[in-house]
């Protein structure tokens, strides 16, 4: 619901999904690397780089370290070790390509562009190198050169949409809006329909062609109302052209799909305060960045993480303040367990962005994952002190307090979060559930039971709540019939959750139903293993 849906990534970045580790065995064979020792001696001083990593003197060792880092998507380490290896054999095209890709993924654009130039001297049809240089040309407003680079490279549907839309934005940058829209309309594939209309609308809006922009925005919005980026652009356009009520309606409709998204919340607050919303895209650079952001977000959802990282890095090169692109990139690093890199990316969200608080919350949660619990809790407490009505921050702080067994503080924090809502909503079930756990751990069972029941009122058949309340009743020897119904229902809803099945097994055990207990407990062990 954040970025537009597209067919699976291929094309310019299709080579990126080749696992780095596939060539790891070659690192053990110096002859496989083809090192040119005389060339390396001439190049080493010129290519020396500062690095936080301790690199060795062995080319094979550095190459192996680079491959492992690449396989683990540790982009900083991969870039460092590939560049170090390249010092020993500066004309090796495979090393140049790997160092180039790693530099792109790490966001080191000066290095990446220099390596792209070198790579194309040895491999003239490298699509990703052409893409990178095309984007550099757009940034430098060298639009004919950009189109020349974008016209080269591999084939494939994703390469077609990338090159087509970036070429369109190069025409827009040159002021040739008619040709830009004609270029967008070359995308005939029905799977690209919404993307086509979206970018045609953005270009028409930039050109001041209100009639064309209105038609294209309406077509894109009518086909995809659950995509934040499209809804945001559509609503901003409507507001600037005298349709504030429609802008509010569009945001409120999206809020029903994804409640309380900070971008929507901020936009609605501005609209209700009488402020005029700025357009989503104000320059050709931002338009081209939007293409790359959309493709990167798609790649991240599809599991093509390296391609997604590269597209997002290129997007941020063109438009460094796009908070959604930053958050999407950080989220990918987080999913790859590259927590330090994720924190670094989260920290680059602008202070005035609606996403700043969310980035700070995610950073705090990652600090806890890294074992820096005190620092994490301080960060969350600072956010809550500054933004006492931010439900996400209060929830995160409550969860951290609960994980640290600070149950009294956790319950108080959850209460503050619940007090922010004027009416009960289904989405609040988790807050009642978490507060119920905090009360139960304090031995305040009456309060805990009331919260669990409230959670089930808001979300009947929620398996986690059924499991917790049902097991608690069995443990206390009360409401046994209803408790077993709850536990069995929880297992029906989550039959592969070993912890839920385990609760049912222990409930049988507590009541002396040992045969049934053994059956469920053995199944729980299998599911957990």
Region locations from a protein language model:
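Position-specific recognition of the canonical hydrophobic site in helix A of tetratricopeptide repeat
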Residues: 70, 104, 138, 172, ...
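Structural marker of alpha-solenoid helical repeat scaffolds
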Residues: 54, 88, 121-123, 155-157, ...
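TPR alpha-solenoid repeat register
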Residues: 61, 95, 129, 163, ...
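Canonical tetratricopeptide repeat
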Residues: 98-99, 132, 166, 199, ...
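Residue-level recognition of tetratricopeptide repeat
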Residues: 67, 101, 135, 169, ...
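N-terminal leader/linker segments that initiate helical-solenoid repeat arrays
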Residues: 36-99, 105-114, 125, 268-272, ...
